[in-house]
Amino acid sequence: MATSASSHLNKGIKQMYMNLPQGEKIQLMYIWVDGTGEGLRCKTRTLDCDPKCVEELPEWNFDGSSTFQSEGSNSDMYLHPVAMFRDPFRRDPNKLVFCEVFKYNRKPAETNLRHSCKRIMDMVSSQHPWFGMEQEYTLMGTDGHPFGWPSNGFPGPQGPYYCGVGADKAYGRDIVEAHYRACLYAGIKITGTNAEVMPAQWEFQIGPCEGIRMGDHLWVARFILHRVCEDFGVIATFDPKPIPGNWNGAGCHTNFSTKAMREENGLRCIEEAIDKLSKRHQYHIRAYDPKGGLDNARRLTGFHETSNINDFSAGVANRSASIRIPRIVGQEKKGYFEDRRPSANCDPYAVTEAIVRTCLLNETGDEPFQYKN
């Protein structure tokens, strides 16, 4: 399996320099979503003092013509800091800074889906919407071949790999453990991880996060995963169906609840929300992957623990349904539900915004409602 040239550099030499004191200066790594809606970019600047909150961080800019976000003749784009985390790569006191992107005219960039999501979340803040997202991904070599798979064939069929233990069942656990610890250090609300059904496929869970913070934490957790994989010389792909055939795809199952759903007899509110979702299936399918449903069409086939992309379904403990109500929620008659439709490469801001629009703002139809300022 091919690994990157950078991973073969002597990391001990690098560490010699990383151990040097940096005085009172702080390194800030600014992170943003590029024009593909899936890729992440980053660059670093120096600050003279340790920022106490994100509001103390300066705005910055970058060349949008090199990130698929603007034309070369008017390429300046603005980075507006919105979330700050500890830097697990350079360590304290350095920071990771997640940013919204704005165009030269101060309007949000086309892939700045956070801007709209924040407005929608503010409208329903009194209902305290909580989200938890289960991010699946697949480890690949730089040649596009799944990590640990035979070079001229396939591993044994699915069955022993989910939550598996052993060198013949778990492929790439070092990367998973490094990512988990880096997220904990950074302050990401990571709550777990496990090996998935397909070999070299893994999952981590983020949440519960309230409102806009769901997207912030998941995007930065993705960034940390890419950086960890960079050090190991491999690639993490969020492609929802990286290997065609009789292999599981990769999703980003999204758990949702409100204060009312979490209280006694909240199951009634859950059932009402599911009924609203059932009447707006195509709107959600379009919101649940960056290509308006085309990526998910490869994954949501009705097989491999998925629903069919053309049909809406719901059930208790049913992993082949669009919406799953966990069995314990059915027993306790309160809690949350799981939307199993979002793809692994979804934008969490688009997913959470769509759920709130339908379930809490009672929107109907195939297009989002345009609210006045």
Swiss-Prot record:
One MF term in the entry's GO annotations: glutamate binding
Residues where Phosphotyrosine is found: Y104
Start and end residues of each GS catalytic domain: 113-373
Ranges for domain GS beta-grasp: 24-106
Superkingdom of source: Eukaryota
Gene3D superfamilies: Glutamine synthetase, N-terminal domain, Glutamine synthetase/guanido kinase, catalytic domain
Amino-acid positions noted as binding L-glutamate in the UniProt annotation, renumbered to this chain: N246, W247, R319, R340
N6-acetyllysine: modified positions: K11, K14
Biological process per Gene Ontology, one example term: glutamate metabolic process
Activity control, per UniProt: Glutamine synthetase activity is inhibited by methionine sulfoximine (MSO).
Binding site for ATP: E134, E203, F204, Q205, I206, G207, P208, N255, F256, S257, R319, R324
Post-translational modifications: Palmitoylated; undergoes autopalmitoylation.
Residue ranges, annotated region (Required for glutamine-induced ubiquitination by CRL4(CRBN) and proteasomal degradation): 2-25
Binding site for Mn(2+) 2: E136, E196, E203
Cofactor(s) in the UniProt record: Mg(2+); Mn(2+)
Binding-site residues for Mn(2+) 1, renumbered to this chain: E134, H253, E338
Protein localization: Cytoplasm, Cytosol; Microsome; Mitochondrion; Cell membrane
Family: Belongs to the glutamine synthetase family.
Reported function: Glutamine synthetase that catalyzes the ATP-dependent conversion of glutamate and ammonia to glutamine. Its role depends on tissue localization: in the brain, it regulates the levels of toxic ammonia and converts neurotoxic glutamate to harmless glutamine, whereas in the liver, it is one of the enzymes responsible for the removal of ammonia.
Name under which the protein is recorded: Glutamine synthetase
